[in-house]
Amino acid sequence: MARYRGSVCRICRRENLKLFLKGDRCYSDKCAFDRRSYPPGQHGQRRTKISDYGIQLREKQKIKRMYGLTEKQFHLTFKKADHAKGITGTNLLVNLERRLDNVIYRLGFADCRTQARQMVRHNHFTVNGHKVNIPSAQVSIGDTIEVREKSRTVAVITNAMEAVARRGLPQWLELDKANFKGVVNAYPVREDLTMPMQEQLIVELYSK
């Protein structure tokens, strides 16, 4: 399935939750979700009854879109989580958080995950001193993610770093802002994820 190319503000309205897909704009009074927090379309303001399957599907779509994955990518991530030890739903969220593009967003080197994914592909970052251009690469404890020397004056990176205070830094990451680098001190745990997510609904959906 192709990646969504339409207005990302419609996604937040569809999922009835601000997913922070447009970076700094989501914190401003220009945010479309704050102005129209009902689903898009002609009948968006109508109340409709939704089935159990529909609830599960919406939860899957919400998390998939928040992290910017295609259906195939999301399903593969779920299968890896299902085969690993532990709770499948928690494993899924931890694996999504450990993606390199997400870590770069969390560190404040990008305004949103979409921007982070693009910058990874353009070789703006190194992991443990080596160039990595795969957004889905999984970081590990002790990994150092650094902005390459020639990229430290790129406007989108410097602007994003100025705005990171609004989001806050997760406890499992450490940021050395002066040297444009971050360190993975631990793996994220469920309590680190404050966005409303019901991962068990996704497990139920894929178990059918």
Swiss-Prot record:
GO MF annotation: an example: structural constituent of ribosome
Pfam families documented for this protein: Ribosomal_S4 (PF00163), S4 (PF01479)
Cross-referenced InterPro entries: Ribosomal_uS4, Ribosomal_uS4_bac-type, Ribosomal_uS4_N, S4_RNA-bd, S4_RNA-bd_sf
Keyword RNA-binding: yes
UniProt KW keywords: Ribonucleoprotein, Ribosomal protein, RNA-binding, rRNA-binding
Limits of the S4 RNA-binding domain: 98-159
NCBIfam families (alphabetical): PRK05327.1, rpsD_bact
Subunit relationships: Part of the 30S ribosomal subunit. Contacts protein S5. The interaction surface between S4 and S5 is involved in control of translational fidelity.
Family membership: Belongs to the universal ribosomal protein uS4 family.
Job of this protein: One of the primary rRNA binding proteins, it binds directly to 16S rRNA where it nucleates assembly of the body of the 30S subunit. With S5 and S12 plays an important role in translational accuracy.
Protein name, entry field: Small ribosomal subunit protein uS4
Gene assigned in the entry: rpsD
